Amino acid sequence: MTINSGGKGSVIILDTDGAVIKNLHLTNSGDHHNDLDSGVQVRGNFNVIKDNVIDDCLFGIDLQQSENNIVKRNHISSKDEELGMRGDAIRLWYSFENKIIGNTITNTRDMVVWYSKNNVIKDNTTVDGRYGLHFMYSQYNLVENNSYKNNSVGIFLMYSDGVKILNNTISHATGAAGVGIGFKETSDIVVADNKIIFSSIGLSIDVSPYQPDTTNYFTNNLVAFNGVGIRFLANWKDNVFKNNHFKGNISQIMVMGGKTANRNVWEGNYWDDYEGFDLDHDGIGDTPHDIYAYSDRIWQDVPGAQFFKGSAMLELIDFLERLAPFSEPDLILRDKSPILDVNLDTITIKENNHSELTPESGPEMLPGFKPENELERRLKGYLQ
């Protein structure tokens, strides 16, 4: 069944408890941002909205002061407007204990969670938007097993404490402001088992954690093939990085203002540019992995020098400084126990009829997308 709003207002306004909206095609809402013209506006509790197609609607599903609702397996797209003029796919405002599960979102603006806590956001796919997921002042939410591709920013948390980000894939957050996962004044978070790949910035950390006596934990994440693996916007502390895998990033770490990231804990991470050995074969490097600020990082503090990034001239200057430094370079970070034996459980080797060893292909990063280049084809194994 199709419900067409005729280009005015919201298609359905759900101001009740315990209703079910399913298997509908909701289309052609109004285009007024101030009225939040939506496919479904929810103003109640214990409702179920599932298996619907919502298209040509400014906003998709808008929940305000609504609790214990289920939003599941909906296909949502916005109006055919410029990115900033689209509406949000799913919007939670002062809404608690909701479950946002298994939705497919394309060509919208953001998914936003504002002033909302104890929500579950799981198994969703978001493509071609601005913010795949944007938190503000929202505590104790769970973000698990989602896929974000070709968005300006994958996930961004502002002033949102106690959030768990687990087993998500964030890729192709490109452009000047492209960030896989970003944190601003956010505390007590757990970021584990995520894949953050092919983005301008993998992780961006700004004054996080913010609350006193709190710690942010980053564990077993793959941060690979980004322009910058981790960017610190300040000389901050109390982040713990353990058993993460930094691979194929142009720069592993960037600290603005010429500061250091060594006030954080770095332990047992894999760095593909580690230059040490493992003579006792315990899987741990015999010497620490140190990252110093040499001339190859001048572009981070002098914007005009970015023109020469990767050039032979800058590489020569960097080589000479490493060979005979004029002064002691600044230590950016030290991982005292870098790991060498990477066990990502990613590539299964099998024998074919010709007794050749070949890797099994991994799954696609997102439905409907095929690898676009050789790097992506190589990375498929890591995404299994």
Where do the language-model regions lie?
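Extracellular beta-strand-rich solenoid/capping regions of secreted or surface-exposed proteins
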Residues: 2-23, 27-47, 59-64
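Extracellular beta-strand solenoids
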Residues: 3-5, 13-14, 26, 42, ...
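Structural detector of coil-to-beta-strand junctions
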Residues: 9-11, 32, 37-41, 60, ...
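Detector for repetitive beta-architecture
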Residues: 18, 23, 46, 51, ...
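Solenoidal tandem-repeat scaffolds enriched in leucines and small polar residues
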Residues: 61-165, 170-171
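Eukaryotic tandem repeat interaction scaffolds
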Residues: 131-229
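Functionally critical loop-and-helix segments that line ligand-binding/catalytic clefts
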Residues: 174-180, 189, 202-211, 217, ...
